[in-house]
């Protein structure tokens, strides 16, 4: 059933938080290659580029940037936090329906007392040749706008092998009759805010706690092409045995991250 538009008493006090982790997986055979991958991914997702992505996110959703704090770290990693504010807006003009959010050159929305932040975590292990890159992103808003409108754009910008997403609505707001409302928009699944092309690229599963207004979606890239996971190595340079070993190693790593548990080796 579609929710009726609420006439609120004062400001909308609901807090809506969207957080997600994206993972990029790579195989680097030698220590030099592992160091090279970490240096490459650290440069690709340095503080300046992350600031550009988050600033574009603010532009898409129509937020005013109040302050930007950014930092690159040694030996690797970066963080960016942007505080944003809302422009005057009529809540009746806000689209709260359940559908994919905008990409660049699309609809704008507005935020208040809100922030967008990202932290990156490159890592590798000397045994096995596996390297992973994780970016944690959070978009938290107060008011009538759902940060889910930014989800579509951000995942397109940070295309990765695995994505885990959490969305939660906290607090309550009152209508003019004093009745408390703990959510002000319809949502059955985070997936409903994703574009069809994104859905076709990933296997997904939901774990939702509707009565607590908590929603969780996991995404695992469907298509696997080994050449996209090798750093400074070509698949044709591998023996059939090495090709299979590395493929199995990468798939095991991706499944473990997707399911959030270690998978015992067979045999």
Curated annotation (Swiss-Prot):
One of its GO terms (biological process) is spermidine biosynthetic process. Pathway: Amine and polyamine biosynthesis; S-adenosylmethioninamine biosynthesis; S-adenosylmethioninamine from S-adenosyl-L-methionine: step 1/1. Is synthesized initially as an inactive proenzyme. Formation of the active enzyme involves a self-maturation process in which the active site pyruvoyl group is generated from an internal serine residue via an autocatalytic post-translational modification. Two non-identical subunits are generated from the proenzyme in this reaction, and the pyruvate is formed at the N-terminus of the alpha chain, which is derived from the carboxyl end of the proenzyme. GO terms for molecular function: adenosylmethionine decarboxylase activity. Binds 1 pyruvoyl group covalently per subunit. The keyword S-adenosyl-L-methionine applies. GO terms for cellular component: cytosol. SUPFAM superfamilies: S-adenosylmethionine decarboxylase. The keyword Lyase applies. The modification Pyruvic acid (Ser) is found at residue 114. Heterooctamer of four alpha and four beta chains arranged as a tetramer of alpha/beta heterodimers. This is S-adenosylmethionine decarboxylase proenzyme. It comes from Erwinia tasmaniensis (strain DSM 17950 / CFBP 7177 / CIP 109463 / NCPPB 4357 / Et1/99). The gene is speD.
């Amino acid at each position: 059933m579609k929710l009726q538009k609420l006439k609120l008493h004062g400001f909308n006090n609901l807090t809506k938080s969207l957080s997600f982790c994206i993972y990029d997986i790579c195989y680097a055979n030698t220590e030099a290659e592992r160091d090279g991958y970490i240096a490459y991914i650290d440069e690709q997702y340095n503080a300046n580029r992350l600031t550009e992505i988050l600033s574009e996110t603010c532009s898409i959703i129509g937020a005013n940037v109040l302050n930007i704090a950014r930092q690159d770290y040694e030996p690797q990693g970066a963080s960016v936090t942007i505080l944003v504010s809302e422009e005057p807006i009529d809540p009746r003009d806000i689209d709260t329906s359940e559908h994919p959010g905008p990409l660049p050159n699309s609809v704008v929305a507005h935020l208040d007392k809100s922030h967008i932040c990202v932290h990156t975590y490159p890592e590798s292990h000397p045994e096995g040749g596996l390297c992973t890159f994780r970016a944690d992103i959070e978009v938290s808003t107060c008011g009538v706008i759902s940060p889910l409108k930014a989800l579509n754009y951000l995942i397109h910008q940070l295309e990765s092998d695995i994505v885990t997403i959490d969305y939660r609505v906290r607090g309550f707001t009152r209508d003019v009759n004093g009745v408390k409302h703990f959510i002000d928009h319809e949502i059955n699944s985070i997936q409903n805010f994703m574009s069809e092309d994104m859905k076709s690229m990933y296997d997904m599963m939901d774990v939702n706690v509707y009565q607590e207004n908590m929603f969780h979606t996991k995404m695992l890239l469907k298509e696997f092409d080994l050449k996209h996971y090798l750093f400074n190595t070509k698949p044709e340079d591998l023996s059939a045995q090495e090709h299979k070993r590395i493929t199995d190693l990468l798939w095991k790593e991706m499944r473990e991250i997707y399911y959030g548990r270690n998978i015992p080796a067979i045999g």
